[in-house]
Amino acid sequence: MEEKIHVLSPDVADKIAAGEVAERPSSVVKELVENAVDAGADKIIVEIKNGGIKLIRVADNGKGIPSEQVPTAFLRHATSKLNTADDLYNISTMGFRGEALSSICAVAKVEIITKTAEAEAGVHYIVDHGICGEADEIACADGTIMIVEDLFANVPARMKFLKKDSTEAGYISDLMTRLALSKPNISFDYICDGKPVFKTSGDGDLTNVILKVYGLKFAKAVMPVDYFEDGVKISGVIGKPELSFGNRTKQTIFVNGRYIKNHVIAKVAEEAFRNAVM
């Protein structure tokens, strides 16, 4: 008998869509931290346990979410960044599609505690693997705390493709390093399995971030770059000839504050240094 074409149930559709956003724990951390950045936070604390599978906690001092908007924030395509299609041409935020929270809460237990500066109290709200709870008032500081637990517990097929906890934690550590480097004006405090990994000051000095994430020897072996021509600004740091590696793990490129992998730019940088490091 032929299989009939049918419309997927919302539950199945949400789990499939979640895989596009919440591919692995590092994807979840990325979405939550970018939300914190978009909220205007200048202090972000990220804590993970068991490679982010057991726990991901992201706390920020951003503007928070008004209590009446919290349940809406977990709906698909719910965003404060867009109103019309024309707005797509003027996006300056890290995210805008309104898919992250709905996708994450479909495959995890998600807890939010948030408060705006204008509110007398905050709000506490839980979505447990797609099942919404009730919003309650809570005493808390301004900003938002997002807690994600038991990631992919209801999607065994997705869990099967994850690597061991230490490897997943490594992916998150790489991500946090790039985020800290891309936003030196934000203080990042990163904790893994109860142990502090690094904490940046948020003073805007990229060299200070490098010192915290790569160490003193690395920080002493870089020099600043600041160049502007034809409306294009290039800034950052490059390593001195004695600071060379056999791969691109320490080569990090950002365009308008976003991390990218671009073989053309990478190749140009390598060619420029070829004679210096040989």
At which residue positions do the language-model features occur?
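N-terminal phosphate-binding caps/lids of nucleotide- and nucleic-acid-binding domains
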Residues: 2-278
